[in-house]
Amino acid sequence: MAYYSMPKASAELKRKEEDEVDSTLRFGFRLLCSTALHPLEYAKTLIQLGYEPIAPRPGRTLFGAKRMMLPNIFQYAAYIKSVDGFIGCFRGLSPKILGNVLSSYYAEKLSVVLVGKMSTRFDDPSFNWFEANLDDINEYMETKDGVVEAMPGGMLRKAVAHVCGVVISHPFHVISIRMMAQFIGREHMYDGLFGSIKEIWLHEGISGFFSGIIPRLWMDFCCLTITSGITYLVAKYLGANKTVCGHVNNIAHFSVTSVFYPYHVVSTCMAVHGSRLKAGNPPLMDYYVNWNDCYARLLLQRQHKRGSSFFFRAVASTPAKMNGAFAPYPELK
């Protein structure tokens, strides 16, 4: 028995090591892509904050309608480069990367403490339900008594790990956003990581590190739950294979994220709101009682989709008040 178990144990150990290497490579690739695309993320953040330094011009939408068109995301990033140079396009990158690294390392460990140790391969956080085939799902659903489980343990663990990751990374997320928001008022309060931590701690306390976390958690929870539910139902009741489930998951994720995108805008605004930055105070930003008030006002002003489009950025409506965040609007003739 020992002779036969040795090769099996060796193969299992080798497979585990390969999975760890693949996971590390995937994470490194994500960091590389995040670094390369940071200038676009920088521009998107400023757009979400409502800062439009370049005046719109008469143009046409994707469907040919005449509208006042704002510059696309690449033109916006080029404007940032013209002001702060190439290095300035990567402002806020270091805390974002640090938050991602800490989140990736500690989120899974913390989820094990909260939920408990995994007992089956389906409880493993690395097990991707989106890539599971119908046989995997049937294997999980069938118990000894033929009773269908109501709550997939693997999905619960994944949700807990995701929430832990957001909580761990959010203080660095706030610092990153505020570093980028300094571009609007040309301040230097958040130039370094330790200086930024001191600034938030002295003027806002511990709550300042978690500004805007509730709408972010709400958006992520809704996207994860709905996307996973759609993929699971398609795999279970339509008999879709792994490839089809992957396509369904991508389409569902894109659609659901688009629906809940306004909460992303709210989270970004609340991350800056209440700070000493000009971008987070009147007249550049309204005073909000809480994130619900922020959402309601953005929705009323038709500004809740700011930054959702990279191209064909049409002006939704003329701002109710010219607060200095907008360049003068020309007339459409």
Give short role names for the model-derived ranges.
Residues 1-28, 55, 62, 108-207, ...:
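Flexible extramembrane linkers and terminal tails adjacent to transmembrane helices
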Residues 37, 41-43, 103-115:
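Conserved long hydrophobic alpha-helices within structured protein cores
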Residues 71, 87, 191, 207-208:
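Alpha-helical membrane and juxtamembrane elements of multi-pass inner-membrane transport
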Residues 89, 205-214:
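Interfacial aromatic "cap" segments that immediately flank transmembrane helices
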Residues 92-93, 159, 213:
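Residue-level recognition of transmembrane alpha-helices
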Residues 93, 97-101, 105, 216-221:
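Selective transmembrane-helix segments that form parts of the transport pathway or gating/packing helices
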